[in-house]
Amino acid sequence: MTKIDPYKSKEAWIKWKAKTQSIPGLSNINSTLILKYLDDMERGINVSILSKKGGRSYIRLKSSKSKLLFLIKSFQDTYNVDNIGNLTEEQLINFFSDMRKGAIKRKDGGIYKSVRDFTKNFKAFWHWYQKISNKAGKEIPDITVYLDSSGTKPDWVYLTESQVRLLCDNAKFEYKALIMFLFDSGIRAPTELVNVKVSDLINDCKELNIREETSKTFGRRIKLMICPELLKEYIKVKNLKSEDQLFDICPSVINRNLKILGKNVFGDEKSLAGQKYSEITMYDFRHISCCYWLPRYKSESALKFRFGWKNSDKIHYYSEMLGMRDTISDDDMLIDITKTEIEQELQKSKREREIQQDQIDTLHLQVQKLAEYIKQLEFNIRSNFN
């Protein structure tokens, strides 16, 4: 089964490249630079030594393209920079500062919430530009040194377990299975989700195999603890075969219907994670699942494995510690030395009890032997008198 691309990123990328000899709205120099940069990123050439080797994904390429085209065109229009190499550090800092303040707005009039993403994309481009210029014998200063790459995390929808079940109770049957599967597995949706086949469900739907070739990071086999029975019913009702997609869905349609369901069940209020219930999407269930499993897993490494994470900071990013509870106990208040002393005393008492028990057993055995001796003595005396 070929990996399914729910966003059709590869198809869109190839189509755009085929029809684009130069980029409309950009000067020849800037257009040539952007096309060369994107081509290098696709092939994995001239990338930072700190970055992973190999070409960038089509999703990443599309995202970089859209952000860079916006930035370079804005620099042209705002600062009359027909050669991006002539952009100054001050111009760059001022532009991104205006983006953060809301002086530069989106086409719909809204404020840019993820300025950090634009910053990171431009930094990557500029460092590439420095590298290729250096190879050509021209030294280019790093004007991105003081560029602020920090940013606030986007709001998301938080649901408790009881709220997830309430949402499920009010959903159509197909959505019940999807909601509980997302909640239980914490799978990346839609990218990993749409690539799950029925045959990836193992051990009577109690385990899920997320294949290496379909995962963003690494393949993994995880346990399903909440949704197995619902999945079995879903597969039976839908008459799905082994090689069928478990959820053959259109992500935009699913997300639209989830938002309607969220509003109908919870209203238009904000959840604890800042986003309105009426804005819930499949992606939110990865956050929600992390919050559910975090206090239940005994080790951080096991939790990271379940969610396909390599770095521990993802745990806080996805959970923000929502749903956590204080599990401190009286036993935890004993420092290691005190606990060791108590354990030693308990061990000593145990040994003393064992010695006492041995002494009692020995005494009991001696009493038994004495009783037998007296009994035999009485028998001998009676025999002599007779």
What do these predicted ranges mean?
Residues 195-233:
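Conserved tyrosine-mediated DNA breakage-rejoining catalytic core shared by Y-recombinases
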Residues 133, 182-205, 301-302:
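Short, charged phosphate-coordinating catalytic segments
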Residues 2-20, 331-386:
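C-terminal secondary-structure termini that scaffold catalytic or DNA-interacting sites
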Residues 161-190:
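Basic, Lys/Arg- and aromatic-enriched nucleic-acid-binding interface segment
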Residues 225-277:
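Active-site/catalytic core of tyrosine-dependent DNA strand-transfer enzymes
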Residues 38-154, 186:
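N-terminal core-binding DNA-recognition domain of tyrosine recombinases/integrases
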Residues 214-216, 307-344:
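Catalytic-site neighborhood detector that most strongly recognizes the C-terminal catalytic loop/helix
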